[in-house]
Regions:
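The feature primarily captures lumenal catalytic ectodomains
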Residues: 1-214
């Protein structure tokens, strides 16, 4: 339910819960904030990073939804949702797509120590960096829904701009750059590839571009 680095691979027998960084904390916790109502915790390790937000945090909504449905309840029965942050556009956009009002969101980055009247903590959908098929299906249904992608003319124009062959550039990334990217782009250009900087596109635009690519 609470992950920390370095994390272990599935089936690892050497992992000990006592090694969690929480138990090695030297500084005192901030003052506890008491929250009334039913609070669902969905934040995850490195949830501020696009990949971990998409494949670790968002699939917890599926786990939560299924658990609530089994009890005859729905997401509307949750008063607050705890996620890492809603600072970045992709976080706000994806939550909106899942029907989560931002006014019901608590950012764990800003409120790391709280006590809820009732706490709901769904498990992670799968091991860290090992995305289960159910999570992939959930994300596809949420963000590759044909009606959702076709209702916005801007999305269609975005896909047409980039075409069928795309190269994802990391030129603007903070880490893991392609050292000879200029040469790679020049080579791929001969084969009709168009360079895409994903950080300049919305999640919906990204989904449309990938859906239309070869």
């Amino acid at each position: 339910l609470s992950r920390c680095y370095p994390w272990y691979l599935p089936g690892c027998q050497r992992h000990k819960a006592s090694s969690h960084s929480l138990f090695r904390r030297q500084t005192p916790f901030p003052e506890v904030k008491k929250i009334s109502g039913r609070v669902a915790v969905l934040s995850g390790l490195s949830g501020h990073i696009y990949y971990h937000w998409l494949f670790d945090v968002l699939p917890r909504f599926r786990v939560l939804y299924k658990a609530l449905k089994a009890e005859g309840r729905s997401l509307k029965d949750i008063d607050y949702f705890v996620v890492n942050s809603v600072e970045k556009p992709f976080q706000r956009e994806t939550l909106q797509r899942l029907g989560i009002p931002l006014e019901k969101v608590i950012e764990s980055d800003r409120t790391p120590h709280f006590q809820a009247e009732e706490l709901v903590v769904p498990s992670f959908a799968g091991p860290l960096d090992w995305v289960p098929p159910g999570s992939m299906d959930f994300l596809r249904k949420a963000f590759l829904d044909r009606a959702y992608l076709q209702r916005d003319q801007n999305l269609a124009e975005t896909a047409e701009t980039f075409g069928k062959r795309i190269y994802i550039s990391r030129a603007n990334a903070k880490y893991r750059h392609v050292l000879n990217e200029a040469a790679v782009v020049e080579l791929l250009d001969r084969f009709g590839f168009v360079t895409v900087a994903l950080e300049t596109l919305s999640v919906a635009q990204q989904a449309r571009v990938f859906a239309e690519a070869e």
